[in-house]
Amino acid sequence: MAKLKGEPLRGYLKTLFAVLSQGDAREESFYPALAQLFTDCAQDYGRTDVCITAQPKKTEGGNPDFRVWDGKQHIIGYIEAKRPGEENLQVISESEQLKRYRSTFPNLILTNFTEFRLGSIHVTCW
């Protein structure tokens, strides 16, 4: 399993822990931190125009939590987030919802905010 590293990750984890320590956060409370992580990582790779839309409009195929844009009105991927600490991403990845999403939305990342799955690629923050 690969590991994320670098400044964007440090800031992201610091924000995650701050939100978690409040004790009353819902899944959506972590969305700004996740969007910022992806934006920062894109910038580190010279992709300064990447835009993240949290909770985009619903489509016929469903509604992943995020859409990732290339800055030129082309969707380059999607992110489906589950609550922080969700340990059964493998089970979730085999659910009807995720099967439908994968068949409809290319480049779908499944995450619990510390583990990220894109197809057979699994990356964790720890």
Model-derived regions, located:
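A short, conserved, highly charged catalytic patch centered on acidic carboxylates
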Residues: M1-N107, E115, G119-C125
